[in-house]
Structure formats: C-alpha cells, structure tokens
C-alpha cells in the first residue's frame, strides 16, 4: 500500500454522488494475481479501507450492539428483513449433497428477482440510476449461488453496498455506530441462517489457519466495542474460552456473538478447530487485538487475490489510482 497524505484521503471521503452523477455496471477488473498491485493503489481500495476504519472508530467502547438508529438505518433493517424472509420460502433440498445444498441456487434466484424492488426501500426515484452499481454489491453480499459458498469476499461486498449508500447521501456519518454494530448484527443473523440452512461452504477458506470459516468483520467491530480502558479492565480476550461468558456476552458484543456461532458449528477442542482465535486469547488487551485484526483484514482479505477478484468496479468504487502517477 502506497503512503497517501491525509488531505487526499479526506478529499476521497468527502466525495459524494447525486442524481446528476454518472453510474455504470460494475466490471470485473481483477482477473489475475498481478492486478492486485493496481487494486492496492486504487480509489476503491482506499475508499473501502477508510470506511472500515471509520466504522471501527464508531464502535469503540459501545457496550451493546443494540443501539438506537435513525430512519435512514431503519430502512437498511427493513431491507435485511426482506432478505431473511426469502429463506422461509425456500426449504433445503432433501437428500445427501456433497457440497452445500442446491436449494441455495433457488434462494439466490429469488433474491435476484426481488432485489430491485427491495432497493426501492432506501433508494429514491431521483437516484434510481445508481441501482445498477448498488445491486451488484448487494447481490454479492449473500454468498455465491454457483459455488454454494459464503466468505469474507461477500462481507466485502456488503461493506461496498453500505458505503455506496453513504456516498449517495442516503446514510450519514452519524449512522456509523449503528451501521457497524446493529446493521452488522442483523446482516450476520441473515447470513448465519443461510450458512446453516443451505450448508454453505467456506469461500476462500484457509482451513483451520483462517480466522473463521465464513466471517471476519464481527471480530473487528466486536473487539472495538471492548477496546476502551473501562471494558478492557472488566473482560479479557481469553474470556472467549469460557462458554458461560460467551453465551452471556453474545447478546451484546459482536466478537462474542461470532465465537458463539463457532461453538455451535464446530466440535472438539477450541484450540484445534480455531487456532488463530485461540492464539489471540494470549493478547493482554482488546485495543491490541483490535489493531491486529484491522492489519490482518488488510493482509488476509484486501490483499488476497482469491477474495478480491470477485469485487467489481464502477464509478462508486473506481479502479483508477488514488494518486496519479
């Protein structure tokens, strides 16, 4: 990653789109591993990573992810509830299936058919042109229908979808806390149900040497919730090894919620099936856990070709370099 001055980052952050802006169908521009160099210098990369860090800052010291939210965020909640409703209409296919449940392809087809209408919940007629870009990230947020899998690349698309709404002025910086915590919580609930119902394979998994088979972002924002001094003095990172504490904290903290889901999905000693998370328990304070996870996200998600190759580029997330050469 090239070093970019704060003024350039601020200009990128302050850029906004409206009804007079041009939009286009996002393209697949990362087609081989060598394209990662250009991506790491692109406006899209900086826009995403900067947004992640802003959401992280908004999460610091917030005890409970059930936070108050604006009418803008309420529309996002309604969108996710509509997505969740589709699962009720598509039961898993019966019989034994080697890789995931093929009914997920029907689920995704139903999502595609209703996606534009679902977008109308938050996108006004004046910005309908922007749908062509937002729909790409929205549909990419809920797994891949061909591979029947879900992973960090789909989380990345959801981050892109939310940032796209922000760029259009449909969300506000005042919403960042609710987005990072409550919207992430609702999104996770939707995606966990998909994983369990259709037995979605881990996408781009490192096996046991990955942080988590399917998710990453809840660990960042959840550790941020505990990164203030007051919280760090009450509960330590090794508390995730205590099932009683995990079950209790899962109702308010995204990190512990993610650990609880692992405990549901996996059997055997924690240090065997989740060695990276187990190693993190040796870190003494949550602020260091949080800093380390942000760096890890940059390296293991935003720098990995198998993950980022599925992210597409339009005018909201341009592939051109942030700093002209």
UniProtKB/Swiss-Prot annotation:
Its EC number is 5.2.1.8. The keyword Thylakoid does not apply. The keyword Nucleus applies. It catalyses: [protein]-peptidylproline (omega=180) = [protein]-peptidylproline (omega=0). GO terms for cellular component: cytoplasm; cytosol; nucleus; protein phosphatase type 2A complex. It is an enzyme of class 5 (isomerase). It is found in: Cytoplasm; Nucleus. GO terms for biological process: mitotic spindle organization; signaling. Gene3D superfamilies: 1.20.120.1150. InterPro entries: Phstyr_phstse_ac, PTPA_C_lid, PTPA_sf. GO terms for molecular function: peptidyl-prolyl cis-trans isomerase activity; protein tyrosine phosphatase activator activity. Keywords: Cytoplasm, Isomerase, Nucleus, Rotamase. Belongs to the PTPA-type PPIase family. PPIases accelerate the folding of proteins. It catalyzes the cis-trans isomerization of proline imidic peptide bonds in oligopeptides. Acts as a regulatory subunit for PP2A-like phosphatases modulating their activity or substrate specificity, probably by inducing a conformational change in the catalytic subunit, a direct target of the PPIase. Can reactivate inactive phosphatase PP2A-phosphatase methylesterase complexes (PP2Ai) in presence of ATP and Mg(2+) by dissociating the inactive form from the complex. This is Serine/threonine-protein phosphatase 2A activator 1. The gene is rrd1.
């Amino acid at each position: 990653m090239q070093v970019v001055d704060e003024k350039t980052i601020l200009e990128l952050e302050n850029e906004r789109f409206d009804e007079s802006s041009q939009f286009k169908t996002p393209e697949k521009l990362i087609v081989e591993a060598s394209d990662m160099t250009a991506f790491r210098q692109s406006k899209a990369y900086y826009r995403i990573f900067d947004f992640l860090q802003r959401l992280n800052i908004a999460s610091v010291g917030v005890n409970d992810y059930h936070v108050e939210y604006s009418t803008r965020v309420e529309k996002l909640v309604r969108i996710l509830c509509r997505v969740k409703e589709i699962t009720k209409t598509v039961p898993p296919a019966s019989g034994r299936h080697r890789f995931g449940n093929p009914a997920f392809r029907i689920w995704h087809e139903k999502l595609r058919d209703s996606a534009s209408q679902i977008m109308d919940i938050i996108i006004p007629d004046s910005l309908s042109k922007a749908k062509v870009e937002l729909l790409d990230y929205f549909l990419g947020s809920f797994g891949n229908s061909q591979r029947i899998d879900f992973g960090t690349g789909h989380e990345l698309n959801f981050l892109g979808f939310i940032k796209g709404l922000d760029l259009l002025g449909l969300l506000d910086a005042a919403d960042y806390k609710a987005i990072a915590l409550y919207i992430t919580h609702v999104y996770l609930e939707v995606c966990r149900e998909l994983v369990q119902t259709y037995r979605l394979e881990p996408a781009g998994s490192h096996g046991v040497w990955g942080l988590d088979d399917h998710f990453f972002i809840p660990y960042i924002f959840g550790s941020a919730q505990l990164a203030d001094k007051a919280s760090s003095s009450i509960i330590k990172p090794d508390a995730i090894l205590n099932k009683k504490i995990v079950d209790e904290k899962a109702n308010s903290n995204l990190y512990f919620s993610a650990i609880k889901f692992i405990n549901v999905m996996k059997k055997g000693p924690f240090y065997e099936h989740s060695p990276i998370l187990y190693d993190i328990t040796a870190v003494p304070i949550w602020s260091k856990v949080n800093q380390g996870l942000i760096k890890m996200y940059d390296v293991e998600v935003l720098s990995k070709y198998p993950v980022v190759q599925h992210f597409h580029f339009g005018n909201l997330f341009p592939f051109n370099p942030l700093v002209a050469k």
